[in-house]
């Protein structure tokens, strides 16, 4: 068969459409295992970094907070920490060596407590008692650093807590001059003065004499929160700038505080004044009375003598005697020498009381 010059075409190749072409299989890489120690270190470093960053921001606020707290504590317009503004004014003046006016309007008990808090150096001797002890001063005691902590109408609670406050501030004196009043040994509620700090006395009984009372430690948390309160800080700022450099000082409500330095001769004042040593100097008119005028006052006092903390005082209380003895031992344990003073009453008064001794048995027991 002769060959055909035309080549025979090859059969067509079937192309399958839609069938995915397979890529050559790749080998899967194994994940490297994390070193747990390195992972821990990375987390720790991250936490430290962010912690330091936050702490640094907080540190920038610390000086501001410290200033706010210190300023509010020292100005303390509401008397939360430093005491009420009026007694603070009195104590500030006395510590600067000034005698102070307007004695009749003073809260004497607050003044005594704030003095114990603020006096920079411990006085060598202090006096406690009621009005009669208030005549002791630096001149007649011969003690330059003497301070009189007596208060008008002082009862046994006033006497003991005045000394106790000095001890709590680490200022126990070398000598305690105690002018004893008869009602110190009277075991009735009638012997108490309404102005005395009953809570402070219960604290003293509980903590020092171990006598059970209803005393509970006050919760100071809410009180101290006020120091960081922006509103209290702002109020203190306003009060400070309002009163800075002013001759007339006001209280938190804007009322004038009427306690000022005595001007002129202290022995020539028309009103009773508080001396810088805590003693009281009565006005010229009171000190200039004649003998007859004084006897008249003594006669008038006879009629109401028992009403002065001694109503029904028939005998000395054994409980009060024990409390008195415990207090003396407590003071001695603080290194304090106790000197007891029995200030005399007017002779006319003694003569009157002796006409009815059955009504004043407790009084005469103390006097004898």
Can you describe what each PLM-predicted range is?
Residues 348-368:
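Substrate-gating cap/lid alpha-helix
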Residues 108-114, 159-166, 323-324:
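Short alpha-helical segments and helix-capping/turn motifs at coil-helix boundaries
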Residues 339-343:
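Short, conserved beta-strand edge motifs with alternating hydrophobic and charged residues
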């Amino acid at each position: 068969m002769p060959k055909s010059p035309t080549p025979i075409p090859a059969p067509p190749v079937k192309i399958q459409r839609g069938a995915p072409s397979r890529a050559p299989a790749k080998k899967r890489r194994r994940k490297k295992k994390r070193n747990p120690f390195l992972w821990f270190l990375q987390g720790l470093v991250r936490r430290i970094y962010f912690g330091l960053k936050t702490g640094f921001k907080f540190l920038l606020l610390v000086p501001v907070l410290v200033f706010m707290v210190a300023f509010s504590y020292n100005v303390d317009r509401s008397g939360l920490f430093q005491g009420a503004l009026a007694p603070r004014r009195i104590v500030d003046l006395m510590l600067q060596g000034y005698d102070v006016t307007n004695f009749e309007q003073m809260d004497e008990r607050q003044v005594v407590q704030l003095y114990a808090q603020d006096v920079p150096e411990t006085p060598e001797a202090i006096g406690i008692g009621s009005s009669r002890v208030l005549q002791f001063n630096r001149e007649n005691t011969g003690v330059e650093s003497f301070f009189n902590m007596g208060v008008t109408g002082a009862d046994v609670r006033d006497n003991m807590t005045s000394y106790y406050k000095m001890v709590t501030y680490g200022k126990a004196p070398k000598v305690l001059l105690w002018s004893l009043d008869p009602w110190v040994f009277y075991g009735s509620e009638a012997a108490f003065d309404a102005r005395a700090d009953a809570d402070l006395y219960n604290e003293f009984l509980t903590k020092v004499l171990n006598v059970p009372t209803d005393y509970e430690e006050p919760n100071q948390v809410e009180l101290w929160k006020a120091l960081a309160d922006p509103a209290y800080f702002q109020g203190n700022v306003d009060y400070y700038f309002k009163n800075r450099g002013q001759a007339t000082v006001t209280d938190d409500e804007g009322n004038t505080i009427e306690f000022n330095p005595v001007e002129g001769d202290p022995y020539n004042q028309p009103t009773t004044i508080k001396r810088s040593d805590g003693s009281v100097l009565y006005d010229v008119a009171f000190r200039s009375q004649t003998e007859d005028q004084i006897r008249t006052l003594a006669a008038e006092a006879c009629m109401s003598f028992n009403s002065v903390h001694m109503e029904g005082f028939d005998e000395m209380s054994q409980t009060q005697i024990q409390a008195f003895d415990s207090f003396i031992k407590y003071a001695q344990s603080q290194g304090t020498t106790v000197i007891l003073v029995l200030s005399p009453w007017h002779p006319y008064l003694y003569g009157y009381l002796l006409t009815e001794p059955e009504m004043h048995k407790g009084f005469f027991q103390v006097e004898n």
